Amino acid sequence: MLARAKFRELTQRSGVDTRANRALVAQIRRLQGEAGSASTKKTCYGCLMAVGFVGAAAALIGAVATNGTDSETQGLCILGIVAGLVLGIVLIPLYGAVAKRLAGLQAQIAAKTETAWKQMEPLNRLYTWDVTVKLIEATVPRLAFDPYFTADRLASLHRKFGWDDSFNDGKSIIFAQSGEINGNPFVFGHYLDMAWGEKTYEGSKEISWTEWEEDADGKRRRVRRYETLYAHVTKPMPVYDEQKLLIYGNDAAPNLSFSRQPSGLTGKDGGLWSAIRKKWRLSRLKAYSRNLDDDSNFTLMGNHEFETWFHAKDRDHEVEFRLLFTPVAQAQMLNLMKDTTVGYGDDFTFIKQKKVNVLFSQHLNAATIDTDPSRFHNWDYDAAFAFFVQFNERYFKDAYFALAPLLAIPLYQQMRPHEDIWKDVLGREASSFWEHEALANYHGEDKFAHPSCITRSILKTRVVRREGGESTIAVTAHGYRGVERVDYEEVYGGDGKWHKVPVPWIEYLPVRRTSNMCLSERGTPSDLFKHRAAASRESAFRRSILSYLATT
């Protein structure tokens, strides 16, 4: 409902004439239908023309081949030549007419679509990066989102909650949305990671040899044999993957660490196999709880159903685990994990390290978490309305159920952090390196990549200079160049000999390139900064931050 109301508000502010746009869109849709029909006719006429002329050519070849020896066949060939030529010639003006009509329709569609874009321009200008999160804040008042991920927010995670930046090693942030729940910080992150994988390459070699064999008459003769030999080698290659996660800081249960993964039990209640599986998991937990030979202090709780589903057997502080997961928390967590009607069920990995909580959700990984307003731009008012509502409702659902495991724990909602004593150390407007990497990725990996790079690039940043709310950021793109290599593998051939089969492969060697990016988080950048940004071929205003790529 809020998304619909917000769209109506934006429409009213924009002054867009919705009736005129609907009428124009109806004309465009009608023209698109006519263009589709004309395109189909053009294709059919073209195919029939080709059939006619190709058939005539084939008949001509047949007539020449008979050379008058078969009068009946030659007569049929002549008939085919005439029929093919008549068909092709008759269709030429029809094809030309429909092609001309199609071109005219396409020109009309382009002109009217441009007019429709101009009609919608006042509305398209009103979309902002925070329009989606403002709707969530209005729906859930205890949630507050930051305009961008500040250094202040990151410092709070470091100093108050013990967050470690080692997580970011070898990763590049694509998008980050920070905020707080009841004063406790959280960050949604979308990042690019690289890991070494393997690729199998194939090579081949043709061989031949001579053999003697007896024919049906018992005579010996020489025959030539041929065989293709294949060989394979497996070599390392960089594999890139994008992931999304949620980081949350809370002082509750500060000495407790645990991890759990999706149980695989969602949607399997009531079946025999499900009952057997749950019973087996519970028996394993009971055996683990009774084992006194290891260093674990794991003690099974009375709620066996919760233990079976949540399955956090690596917890290291039983008292704080019970303090965190009260009977109410257990019930709410079970409801969350079982529900696939409204929510996504048990699709989340939950890792708690002292005061830091990290969650990975399958649905979040498939979701869109960036709020780029350009995605709402449209020339069709009704289509824009439908997409705006659908996107924002889906965004709310994805974000809410990513946060739901945290919201299911009452103690997390009761704990509010003390006033952040570090909030003035770096200044509230300074953006964090997460935001710098996201900005660089927004400009595009290709803008920073090494010229020899043939893979994706991991973009890492550092602040070179900061003065008066304006910063120079060094962006280093880490990628790999490819060097062609050849291995020779010995393969046994049908000739009874070993052959060296060449297998070409690519060796990936690291390359990097550093470029400068300038940015200003201030609402009103200096005139000099704005002039330089305007002069740059690559500038962007994103989430209250104006940035441009400096020439080198």
Label each region the model flagged.
Residues 27, 69, 257-260:
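N-terminal targeting/docking segments
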Residues 21-24, 93-204, 536, 545, ...:
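N-terminal topogenic membrane-targeting module
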Residues 36-116:
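Transmembrane alpha-helical hairpins and terminal membrane-anchor modules
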Residues 79-82, 86, 116, 396-404, ...:
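Generic detector of bulky aromatic hydrophobic side chains
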Residues 460, 468, 472, 476, ...:
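Long C-terminal extensions of eukaryotic subunits of large macromolecular complexes
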Residues 1-43, 541-545:
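Cytosolic juxtamembrane N-terminal segments of multi-pass membrane proteins
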Residues 56, 63, 134-137, 141, ...:
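Short alpha-helical interface elements
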Residues 156-437, 442-446, 450-487:
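Structured extramembrane domains adjacent to transmembrane segments
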